[in-house]
Amino acid sequence: MDIAPEDKGENVRREICLTLEQMGIRPECSHHEQGPGQNEIDFRYAEPVKAADDAVTFRTVVNTVALRNGLAADFSPKPLRSEPGNGMHINLSARSSTGKDIMPQVIAGILSHIADMTAFLNTTPASYQRFGSYKAPRYISWSSENRSQLIRIPAAEGEYRRAELRSPDPICNPYIAYTLLIYAGLDGIRRRAELPASADINFYTASEEVRSQYKTLPATLADAKAAAKTSEFIASSLPRTVVEYYTK
């Protein structure tokens, strides 16, 4: 991983962050990522619609600043087959007006519907080449232990207590993605869904015997589309025309 002064993207990231701040989006951290020319910028949480607006604005700013510096930004999920892919980790929090801890039910709801949602979170064949390596999840699981999980629970409390969904990639439509996550979480609350036991293992090093105990995300885009087409949850959450467009 490049570090200053060898990190050639440092000045570009700084320019992106300053531009975002001028547009009312608050960057929280930026750094070189694991792959060559790969960079990460995290920005502050917001209510769902604002968060989706921020995600779209972010992509526009990155593309514009990159072009201004003679570069091209690539948000595709797997730009280089033998290198880490690009993810769009979604951090989400939910609070009850009564003070009850509803996060376990929200996470359980998302886990129960994630396979049906995947066609909308990972929309290209290359999306599925990313799963299962370089910190990208393959198994439907949660834990606070490591980054091989589908849902990671960061060590944070108070307003920063959250769940991090690690499967989506940056070319998904954030409005659709957030809609599905909200409906899945609400379904978990409505059903009082029970959160399965945490998977406190590293799936990248675990034995096949251990990994076989867990369900996986769809292996291909065709598998993901097939799951979405027959899903009552998807049919009840999105307009029919949207479902048909993403599953054709």
Where are these regions (language model features)?
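Glycine-rich, acidic/polar active-site loops that bind/position phosphate-bearing ligands
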Residues: M1-K248
